[in-house]
Amino acid sequence: MAEAAATGAGGEMMAAVAAGEGCSGPAGLSLGRGFSGYRPFEPQALGLSPSWRLTGFSGMKGUGCKVPQETLLKLLAGLTRPEVRPPVGRGLVGGLEEAAQEAGLPVRAEPSPTFPTLGIGLDSCVIPLRHGGLSLVQTTDFFYPLVEDPYMMGRIACANVLSDLYAMGITECDNMLMLLSVSQNMIEEEREKITPLMIKGFRDAAEEGGTAVTGGQTVINPWIIIGGVATVVCQPNEFIMPDSAVVGDVLVLTKPLGTQVAVNAHQWLDNPERWNKIKMVVSREEVELAYQEAMFNMATLNRTAAGLMHTFNAHAATDITGFGILGHSQNLAKQQRNEVSFVIHNLPIIAKMAAISKASGRFGLLQGTSAETSGGLLICLPREQAARFCSEIKSSKYGEGHQAWIVGIVEKGNRTARIIDKPRVIEVLPRGTAATALAPENSSASSEPSL
């Protein structure tokens, strides 16, 4: 470890952080809930050319299409109305009495209740409703194809939309809408064969999440786009505000990093110029396995982790997507009520993706800036609860494929986040593979980690 452990995290848990320890299910052939029996997509089985590629109908991939975070906040500044409702916090909800009076409803004599509120720039919006002490929690997301299998692309898109609710510990979604753009560059045969598969994948993932797709919007566009809106009405005790991290908490991550690297490397198999830059550090078979692992991880719902956030008293969380683990950590740190900062020591990464990132000179994976799509939850947990969370999430009662690693600590600070100079890379082996005989320097294989 290149830097000394911060004070206040506790000796026992810091030992786990320093060792790069975590929890994951044993390597095996199970594909996880919803993926058993999966067969790789073959275009020719649908009567399409073997060279047909879903990713050929867009110029960007997945959550890599996001506007840079600083630019985004500037663009959205005009939407913020602090006089009505603070962007984050637990302030009084202004205007509720006036709205009730206008509607002819009785107004209580006592002061307005205090409701949790979230607004622009965060994972989900939390809007207090006028009746019954309930809140509307809503999120929307969409992106472009990043895998070739249209069914799995639909699942990934739905999982990504729901993940913003899961980041708040919400496990139930009342309704989903689907947003779909069909490429004008597709011939009619392609549209008729591919589009239903994307829709089915989205619908199946929604059903796995206990919700349903009841509408949406479908348009023609040069690029394929898929995403949606997730909505739930709930009581304040059903969600966890992302603002209560305390000194001594530890950071837990529930999916490995490297999805964007994996899907790009998979496309480079057919691009000699790109492939020549990485072929000395990875084999074609390793790229195929990493791509499949990335696809299954992206399509896995964060619902189990969301439920366990309540069980183990999580203080805050976010999901890791287009801004990378560092960008989302920084955004989460800014929302904290206490004067804390996040320090990341360990980076669980799909095996060989760190080497590809270095060899290609792209992505910024070890710097934490590489985009992820439908990534895991980064959760602030009490020190004494983190190990139990990691152990519980891999229980067979939740299905195969769930993982978690302790990746950092919460220390006293000024609401910032950083990755240490030489983070420990945890090589996460694709399911169905055996542990490597020798892990690279400054890394550890994770087939059977212990706490």
Curated annotation (Swiss-Prot):
SUPFAM superfamilies to which the protein is assigned, alphabetical: PurM C-terminal domain-like, PurM N-terminal domain-like
GO molecular function term, any single one: selenide, water dikinase activity
Function: Synthesizes selenophosphate from selenide and ATP.
EC class of the enzyme, as a word: transferase
Binding sites annotated in the UniProt record for Mg(2+): D123, D164, D319
Keyword Magnesium belongs to the record: yes
Gene it is expressed from: SEPHS2
Protein's name in the database: Selenide, water dikinase 2
GO cellular component entries: cytoplasm
N-terminal signal peptide: none
Sequence positions bearing Phosphoserine: S49
GO biological process, one term: selenocysteine biosynthetic process
Active site per the UniProt annotation: U63
